[in-house]
């Protein structure tokens, strides 16, 4: 991340969201890719695409047609991701020599050291929680209404569609060392409080 954005993020991390300057906030939440109709929008981190790999003289990329995104950043794509996390279903592992139950003890072990926003819901039957230490993010009124409407839908039950609250590697509550989610609403731009887990942490 460039020095200018790092400076703003550091400053904002010591303030409440209501104290952020409008000008600096606009600088780190901007995403010019959503205005370009010729390309798919990119997820950015504080307005920067620094974590996406690009061809360079020292690491040239030669490709015919579309090339999957890659990253040279420390922490890779977790530097800009949304931290969604679900265990694989057996249908996701059809070409693997193992089944999801073989991984169960390792999912539980990994989650011991990570912030985990999750709750028992309609996803749990197909996607076990693998943790008893659940600290779910509080849903907005709109999200709660959506989930309630889906729960009442006969169509969802007939088609056996699994749904529920997003499972996120996100620190919902303040702990001894770090603040929890401030519910500022800018998660998709990056979290100045480092509540969204990155593998570089």
Residue ranges of model-derived segments:
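Glycine-rich FAD pyrophosphate-binding loop
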Residues: 1-23
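Short, solvent-exposed loop/turn and secondary-structure capping segments
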Residues: 8-12, 83, 174-175
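Conserved redox-cofactor binding core of oxidoreductases
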Residues: 24-47, 58-63, 67, 89, ...
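Core domains of carbohydrate- and sulfate-ester-processing enzymes
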Residues: 48, 52-54
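Conserved phosphate/anionic-ligand binding catalytic regions in large, soluble enzymes, centered on
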Residues: 69-84, 187
């Amino acid at each position: 991340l460039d020095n200018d954005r790092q400076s703003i993020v550091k400053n904002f991390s010591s303030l409440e969201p209501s104290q952020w300057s409008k000008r600096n906030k606009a600088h780190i939440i901007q995403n010019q890719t959503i205005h370009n109709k010729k390309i798919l929008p990119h997820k950015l981190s504080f307005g920067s695409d620094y974590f996406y790999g690009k061809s360079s003289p020292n690491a040239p990329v030669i490709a015919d047609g579309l090339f999957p995104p890659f990253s040279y950043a420390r922490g890779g794509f977790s530097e800009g991701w949304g931290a969604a996390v679900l265990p694989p279903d057996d249908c996701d592992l059809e070409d693997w020599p193992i089944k999801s139950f073989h991984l169960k003890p390792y999912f539980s072990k990994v989650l011991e050291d990570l912030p985990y926003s999750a709750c028992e819901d309609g996803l749990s039957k197909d996607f076990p929680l693998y943790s008893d230490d659940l600290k779910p993010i509080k849903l907005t009124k709109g999200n709660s209404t959506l989930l309630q409407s889906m729960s009442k839908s006969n169509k969802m039950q007939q088609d056996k569609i699994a749904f529920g609250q997003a499972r996120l590697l996100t620190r919902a509550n303040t702990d001894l060392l770090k603040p929890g989610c401030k519910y500022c609403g800018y998660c998709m731009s990056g979290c100045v409080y480092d509540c969204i887990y990155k593998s570089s942490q």
